[in-house]
Amino acid sequence: MKIVVILVLFIAASLVARAQDDSITMPELVQNAQQWAQENLDTNVLNSLSDVDERAVQQFFSELEQEYQGEYVVDIASLRDTAQSVLPLLETQDETHPYAAWLKAQMDYLDVADEIRITIPPTETGTNQPPQPIPNPSAQTERDLWFKKDSTTNAWPVSAKEYVAELKPIFSAQKVPPELVWVAEVESGFDRHALSPAGAAGLFQLMPDTAKRFGLSLWPRDQRYQPEPSAIASARYLKYLHDRFKDWRLALASYNAGEGTVQKLLERYNANSYDGIAEHLPAETQMYVPRIEAVLKLREGANLEQLSAPLS
């Protein structure tokens, strides 16, 4: 009961803050959260929670998705305390473990966003002017933050020991650098059961349409949860994205945000590189790409820019 009370208080505080920031009324915000949850979350999974817990988790996931797709990285930090309360709640039930596995892989985003909030000062404004949001860090600043954070984290995810050696040859067979198997650490923490609130699943967090596009079956067994088929599809997708954008940073940004989003930003800002659009990408993607760079450096001593292009 105690964790439920704490969780509801955190959710309420988060909702109030959001309502104040965007001039949205509390009933409207709650209704938006419920509508998003109905459209995206697997209610059969969440039904294992109490009614109070289920509503709180739905609202939290809705808020997190909204901040992930938002403009400012620092805004994600507002949900850090809530996430720390939601995670153990999801871990209490076998049925909600897939969401717990996904959320656990997200916690570093919340920590780094909070560090940005602390270290980057808000933009100064004139007298009697409303405060401006904390600006997004540059792409290089993000890389530096992630390299610093990951330099203190040497232990492999437990499941990585089981999968890395098995899946690297699959990436090589698809003509993709085998080091990119570590995308799974960022996507799912190497937990093949991970399920995101948006519907991405498995080690490599493939959405249903993407999975089918690259040869996976979702019925009668969802192959996204099977390590080898999901690795094949992920490698094929990464190869396709690099063939399109000719750059691993842009390919990874597209893997996370969608190739249409990346293409539109390149055109809008007349850019030809990741750094040229980084500060305009969705907040999650702004952290996703440098996080993968840091993981590759930590696990393989590899530089993303120096990874070879996929072979024909």
Model-derived features: positions:
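Cell-wall glycan-active module
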Residues: 2-184, 272-273, 279-280, 294-295, ...
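Glycine-rich, acidic and aromatic/proline-enriched surface loops and short helix-turn segments
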Residues: 173, 185-190, 203-216, 257-261
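Short, functionally critical alpha-helical segments immediately adjacent to catalytic or ligand/cofactor-binding
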Residues: 175-193, 234, 251-256
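Catalytic and binding regions of secreted/periplasmic enzymes and modules that target cell-wall glycans
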Residues: 238-267
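A structural motif
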Residues: 205-210, 256-268, 289-305
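Substrate-binding/active-site groove segments that recognize
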Residues: 198-220, 231-238, 264, 289
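Second-shell loop/turn segments in exported
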Residues: 146-158, 166-170, 191-200, 216-227, ...
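Solvent-exposed, polar/charged alpha-helical surfaces in well-ordered, non-transmembrane soluble domains
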Residues: 165, 169, 181, 232-239, ...
